[in-house]
Amino acid sequence: MAPQAPDRDKALDLALAQIDKNFGKGSVMRLGEGVRQPIAVIPTGSIALDVALGIGGLPRGRVIEIYGPESSGKTTVALHAVANAQANGGIAAFIDAEHALDPDYAAKLGVDTDALLVSQPDTGEQALEITDMLIRSGALDIVVIDSVAALVPRAEIEGEMGDSHVGLQARLMSQALRKITGAMNNSGTTVIFINQLREKIGVMFGSPETTTGGKALKFYASVRLDIRRIETLKDGTDAVGNRTRVKVVKNKVAPPFKQAEFDILYGQGISKEGSLIDMGVEHGFIRKSGSWYTYEGDQLGQGKENARKFLLENTDIRDEIEKKIKEKLGIGADVTATDEAPADF
């Protein structure tokens, strides 16, 4: 016979008290008790992408995967997130498994390269062990791993060229993600995995594209971003940048499948002013008539490039437009109004 309700409640309270004593306060909690913290975020550098993510940026303490074709802007988006984390007083690390980080380009995007922790590991095991130790220190705000495809298992590096090492990298990723996920949640460290695309052989229906490193990352990631270059931006006949589209393929903290478009300028990164113009026109703060852009009677310029230059020189107007967009959409650097979603890893 089941115990009566008062006895059950008393037994549960005793069990919860013992759990708190053994494992720390908050180890088990009722979802409606109000002890949940709102989701803290790291802005991406593009207001359009922040809106598409639903909470104003990349969630802290979660796994993020950014993937796409070569030269699509994956590292650029990750470096902008690093710069924004540092701008808010955070500490960042970059695990450069590809040995391809350009410090000068990172500095142009706003990254404090003097304070950035950089590691160029020899093996995938070393890279992920370093990541685990940095997360467990509790001091890091963001860690970027560039890229999953370059996390080569030690056995493959030490073996002969042509040897078969089926599933080694997938097992390595699965084990590493099992280890770091809990530590990330406790420390609030965001880990961004940059990934490459491969094509599956013999696929007749559906997309043949897949990402490297097995399936574990797909499951553990709270946010997956598919980034593509859709257009080349030109100034006359000279290419000056790319129009980029990002699709939020997976999102555990807000509705998924939203898209964002923004400009990435060569040598400058994501154009903040370009994003503000696009969002301003979309939400009625900036008026576009023909090729002219106007804001509250002030002409910003003829053509998007001239309007972009105007906002770059007139930061007060730029900041005013940004503030209005963020107020209307309910996002910003202090976007913490959304209740924390359960970490369903």
Curated annotation (Swiss-Prot):
ATP binds at G68, P69, E70, S71, S72, G73, K74, T75. PROSITE patterns: RECA_1, RECA_2, RECA_3. It is found in: Cytoplasm. One of its GO terms (biological process) is DNA repair. The keyword Transmembrane helix does not apply. SUPFAM superfamilies: P-loop containing nucleoside triphosphate hydrolases, RecA protein, C-terminal domain. One of its GO terms (molecular function) is ATP hydrolysis activity. Can catalyze the hydrolysis of ATP in the presence of single-stranded DNA, the ATP-dependent uptake of single-stranded DNA by duplex DNA, and the ATP-dependent hybridization of homologous single-stranded DNAs. It interacts with LexA causing its activation and leading to its autocatalytic cleavage. Belongs to the RecA family. This is Protein RecA. It comes from Rhodococcus erythropolis (strain PR4 / NBRC 100887). The lineage of its organism: Bacteria, Bacillati, Actinomycetota, Actinomycetes, Mycobacteriales.
